[in-house]
């Protein structure tokens, strides 16, 4: 049973394979037919295109032959035309030479005529300028007069306003004065009447009181009457004083009234004078205005003539400017070339200066360092000298030794035994011969050497001091507290050192200080502290 089933399956599979082979063969045949038809169509298309290309090549060959023939004809025509043009150019060159000669002749004639015209017109211009200046002066005088007239008119308006204000002020003051007078008179009469009434009342009251007291106390009558009399005298004196003050006020008001009346009269007189001046000035203004109109017409006529002459001269100047513009262009071209050369020189100079500044900075740093060392050494030496002096003074006070010489440490000018004198000894070139090592020199001498080298490098003459001569006074002094008091500006010295500024170096050897003081003539003084 199982073997039969397997045979059936194998038969079915073989039938399927044969069907697949048949289908593949049919598909290959169809593809071949399609390819053949496609290649046939392509062949036909290529044949047609070949025929077309053959026809076009024939037509192009014919047209090429025609163009060659035309080219030959054109070349012949061009040769003939060129020969004709050359002849014409030769004739034109001859004509140009003749015209150049004529042009030079005409230029010479025109230059002569131009010189004559320039002389003529310069004379006319000078005459016109003289006339113009005269007229301008006259017009300036008229303008100044007009300005004065206008200022007078403005001043007149101001004066009129001031007069009106003064009139109003006078009226107001008169009114106020009269009101105050009325008020004061009424107050004065009222006060007078009131005081009289009060006095009468007091007298009546005092009389009644005196009568009653006389009746009651007849023993004390004299004493009370005396007191009342004293009181009444004081009251009367007070009222009389008030009356005198009121009279003084009334007198002052009367005096002020008189002054105001006097001022009013003066103002009236001034107003009359100003009115007379205004009338005169109006007549002067009218005459001046007529003169101005006449001068303006004359000035307009002169300006027209002057403008016409100026236009002519401007035309001549334009022609000359056009001729000079060509020369200006040439000069500008030369200037540009010179500027380029100058820029190159500047670049070279800048490079040289940049290289030079590096050396200058090195020397400046060295000088600065030497100065710092000098300051430190001087400060240290002062401290040591002061300590030694103090020890000797203490020993002398104790009676062990004699008192030393007085010594100053504040750098005074007239001191005979100062520490600065010892410090200045370090600047002297004593006991020094040739071939000296720089390490054996003092800091002050090192600074001098550096400055001398820097001056020689810059090409500046250096100052020379003899050994016997006194060096310059230092620009600073080290105080007891250790602070440096500078009398000179170090920045100025550094600015003067640069070669780019072309300023000679100043020998500031007085500013340098030594850490170690050489043995000199003052050694005996320092040893006897």
Swiss-Prot record:
Subunit: Interacts with MNS1 and ODF2.
An annotated GO BP: flagellated sperm motility
Record key words, sorted: Cell projection, Cilium, Coiled coil, Cytoplasm, Cytoskeleton, Flagellum
Domain of life: Eukaryota
Location of this chain's protein in the cell: Cytoplasm, Cytoskeleton, Cilium basal body; Cytoplasm, Cytoskeleton, Flagellum axoneme
Provenance organism: Macaca fascicularis
Family statement: Belongs to the BBOF1 family.
Protein name in UniProt: Basal body-orientation factor 1
Name of the gene this protein is made from: BBOF1
């Amino acid at each position: 049973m199982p073997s039969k089933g397997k045979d059936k399956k194998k038969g079915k599979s073989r039938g399927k394979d044969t069907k697949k082979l048949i289908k593949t063969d049919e598909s290959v045949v169809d593809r071949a037919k399609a390819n053949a038809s496609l290649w046939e169509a392509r062949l036909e298309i290529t044949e047609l295109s070949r025929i077309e290309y053959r026809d076009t090549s024939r037509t192009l060959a014919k047209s090429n032959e025609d163009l060659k023939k035309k080219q030959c004809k054109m070349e012949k025509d061009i040769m003939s035309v060129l020969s004709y043009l050359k002849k014409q150019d030769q004739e034109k060159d001859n004509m140009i030479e003749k015209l150049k000669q004529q042009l030079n002749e005409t230029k010479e004639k025109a230059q002569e005529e131009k010189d004559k015209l320039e002389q003529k017109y310069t004379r006319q211009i000078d005459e016109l300028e003289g006339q113009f200046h005269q007229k301008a002066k006259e017009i300036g005088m008229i303008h100044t007069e007009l300005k004065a007239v206008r200022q007078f008119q403005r001043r007149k308006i101001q004066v009129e306003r001031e007069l009106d204000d003064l009139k109003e002020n006078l009226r107001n003051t008169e009114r106020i004065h009269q009101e105050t007078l009325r008020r004061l008179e009424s107050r004065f009469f009222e006060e007078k009447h009131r005081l009289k009434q009060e006095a009468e009342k007091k007298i009546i009251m005092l009389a009644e009181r005196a009568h009653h007291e006389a009746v009651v106390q007849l023993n004390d009558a004299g004493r009370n009457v005396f007191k009342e009399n004293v009181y009444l005298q004081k009251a009367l004196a007070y009222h009389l004083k008030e009356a005198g003050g009121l009279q003084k006020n009334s007198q002052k008001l009367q005096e002020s009234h008189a002054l105001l009346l006097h001022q009013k009269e003066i103002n009236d007189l001034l107003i009359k004078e100003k009115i007379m001046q205004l009338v005169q000035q109006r007549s002067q203004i009218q005459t001046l205005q007529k003169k101005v109109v006449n001068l303006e017409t004359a000035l307009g006529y002169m300006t027209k003539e002057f403008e016409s002459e100026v236009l002519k001269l401007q035309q001549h100047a334009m022609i000359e400017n056009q001729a000079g513009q060509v020369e200006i262009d040439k000069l500008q071209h030369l200037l540009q070339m010179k500027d380029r050369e100058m820029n190159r020189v500047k670049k070279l100079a800048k490079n040289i200066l940049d290289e030079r500044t590096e050396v200058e900075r090195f020397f400046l740093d060295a000088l600065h360092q030497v100065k710092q060392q000098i300051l430190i050494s001087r400060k240290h030496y002062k401290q040591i000298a002061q300590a030694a002096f103090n020890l000797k003074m203490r020993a002398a006070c104790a009676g062990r030794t004699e008192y030393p010489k007085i010594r100053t440490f504040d750098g005074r000018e007239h001191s005979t035994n100062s520490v600065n004198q010892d410090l200045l000894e370090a600047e002297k070139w004593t006991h020094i011969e040739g071939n000296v090592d720089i390490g054996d020199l003092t800091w002050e001498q090192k600074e001098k050497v550096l400055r001398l080298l820097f001056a020689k490098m810059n090409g500046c003459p250096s100052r020379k001091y003899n050994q016997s001569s006194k060096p310059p006074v230092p620009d600073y002094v080290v105080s007891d507290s250790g602070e440096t008091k500078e009398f000179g500006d170090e920045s100025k010295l550094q600015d003067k050192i640069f070669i780019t500024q072309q300023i000679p170096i100043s020998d500031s050897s007085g500013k340098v200080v030594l850490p170690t003081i050489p043995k000199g003539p003052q050694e005996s003084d320092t040893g006897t502290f």
